[in-house]
Structure formats: structure tokens, C-alpha cells
Amino acid sequence: SGNWAEDDGNIALFIADNEQLEAAAVSKDILLKISNGVEPHDICILCKQKPQDYASAIIEELEKHGVRARIETGYQDLIKEPIVDLFIKFMICADSRKHPNEWTFIEELLVELWGISGMRENDTFDEMQRKLSAVVNVVKKNIQQKLDTEQWHSTLNSIIDFFGIGNIKAKFPAYKQGTYFMNVINQFESLFFEEYVAAHGVWNLAIENFRGDHSVPIMTIHKSKGLEYNAVYFIGLEDSAFWNFRNQPDEDRCTFFVALSRAKASVTFTFCKKRTGMKCPMQRHNAINEFFDLLQRPGIAEVKRFQNR
């Protein structure tokens, strides 16, 4: 990472005639890495512009082979929310008591939210533990049956009511602003339920899938700040993705090197000659040709071409 040295890892440039060839090549490469022991969540697909415009064919191709790739737009910020972190930890405890770290986190947060003195011996603490066990058992009973949207809604509300909306907002002042708190809750409620349905009601799998434990994340370069992955695929090294290059060359060069620095072992750039879903389907790399010159220098990148037969 950082400044790329030749022995830092593998760099490749895939040049494809169309999205289907690009998707097949990228998917095959990802599947090979997974078969060699790389976890899906340690592989990342990056785009300069909207991921759905560049990665849809790849998502479909991977799905055919049982690998899920997920555009992280809705999930990424949500997972960092304190209230979502609390929900997830609470649901982990409801699913199984074999998670002492999550259990301790919830107890300590309750002590703070309810203003209990931290003495574990006192009666108030014992009372809190009893109430916590009771509500955890109710949630456990709920999640052991197949939930519909209404039951899921009331289960979530019972967790919120237990901690207390006022207490939560006092602890996390950002939630006092307008409808922000309810927006976060509603977003979590619908996204998590989607995962729950997709996991056929298997609770711990729904939690893992919501966290992205088993999927290949897809995001913009901008959203990848501070993250590192074993393998990175930058989809769309094309003029139309870097449409403002002439006005902001330094910023866009930085983007190119950020893609390199996200990767621990390998980075692959793709250029697709024709993207049918785009306003201008035919793609070029005239404006950003310096990137191609760099990648095509001897010893830098392995260049592979995928052409219509």
C-alpha cells in the first residue's frame, strides 16, 4: 500500500470489448481468489462513479456462481451508527448467550443509560440484569419463529422501548436532530428484514449477511477511504468515469493511486470498450491515457484482452 513498489503485489489491466466479457473475466478472477482461500469480504470492487452503472453485470455473473456482491451505499454508513451497533449486539445475545463481549457491552451501556451506579453487587444492578434477561428472552422467542414485517417491527420497537428513546438520544446527541433517529431506525428495519428473508429466516446468518461477512463489497473510491482489502478491482478506467480530468488532473491522479493503495495483494483495473447502459456507450481513454501508459510499461501490469470471437 501507499506508494506502490513492484514487489508489493500483482497489478493487472483487463481490456474487454463489452460488459459481459468484462463481467465474466472479473468474476472468474474473483472466484479463483475465493477458491484459493480469500474471503469474499476481503475483495472489493471500486468505481469512480455510480457503482450500479458499472458493476451490475458483475453482480449478476457472480450470483450465478453463488457469490454475492453488494453495493454498500445503503449499508456502509448505517453499520457505523451507534443504535445499529446496539441492535446487532442485542440480537446476537438474543440468538445465543455464548457472546460475553456483546453481553458486557449491553450491560455497561444500560448502566450508563439508566444512570445506575456501577456497583455490580447492588440491588438496582441485579434488577437491571433481570429486566435485561426478560426482554432478551422475549426477543429470542420472537426470532425463533418466522417473523413477518409487523412482528419484526414490534420486536425492534420492544428493544428501543427497553433502552428508552430519551436515554438513547441523551447518550448520542446526533439523534436529537429532526427525524434523523427515525430515519436510521426505518432504514435498518427494512434493510435487515431483506437480509432476514434472503437468509430464509436463519437469524445469525441474517446478522452476518447484514454486516457483509459473506459478500464482496462494491463502493465508490470516495467511500473506500481508510479501508484495505486483499484484492481490489477498479471497474471503468475510462474517460467518462474521469469526465472532469482536464479540470482536476491532480485529484483524479490521486483517485487512481488510492485504488492501488486499497489493495494488499492485487489490484485489477478494467477498461470496457462498450457499456450499453451508458448515455454514450463507446468508451475511450484519451484524456486519462497517462494511466494506460503507466500500466503498460514493462513489468508494471499484466495486460489481458477479452474480445468478441
Locate the predicted segments by residue.
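Conserved nucleotide-binding/hydrolysis micro-motifs of P-loop NTPases
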Residues: 49-53, 76-78, 239-240, 274-277
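A short acidic (Asp/Glu
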Residues: 51-59, 82, 229-230, 279-280
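Extended, charge-rich low-complexity interaction segments
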Residues: 96-128, 203, 293-305
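C-terminal accessory regions
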Residues: 129-146, 238-309
